[in-house]
A protein has these predicted regions:
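Protruding loop/beta-arch "assembly-hinge" segments enriched in small, turn-prone residues
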Residues: 64-85
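Amphipathic alpha-helical interaction segments
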Residues: 35-38, 42, 61-69
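Conserved short "hinge" loops at termini or chain/domain junctions
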Residues: 1-52, 81-85
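Short, hydrophobic/amphipathic alpha-helical patches that form generic packing surfaces
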Residues: 52-63
């Protein structure tokens, strides 16, 4: 099962259409770009913490809660700071 399929499953899309898969893959790509811009090394993008960030990001984007993803004391910021070490 691919990473995007696992995230789709967690979001509740068990047998999703190709459009939703492409949409969620775009969210994952956004999360990866954000992590790279924050200084996360490319080799850490396949870690469990990076996967958690991608899942949180995709979930928030899917719900339309874009502004709530990145907060000073939020989970995404905490995970990224751990990945930067």
């Amino acid at each position: 099962m691919s990473e995007v399929d696992k995230i789709l499953y967690k979001l509740g899309y068990y047998d999703s259409d190709p459009h939703k898969k492409t949409e969620v893959q775009g969210y994952i790509d956004e999360a990866v770009e954000f992590m790279l811009d924050c200084g996360v090394k490319r080799e850490k993008l396949t870690s469990q913490r990076a996967y958690a960030i991608k899942s949180i990001w995709a979930d928030a984007r899917d719900k339309g809660e874009v502004d709530d993803v990145i907060k000073k004391d939020g989970m995404v910021v905490a995970l990224i700071s751990q990945l930067r070490r």
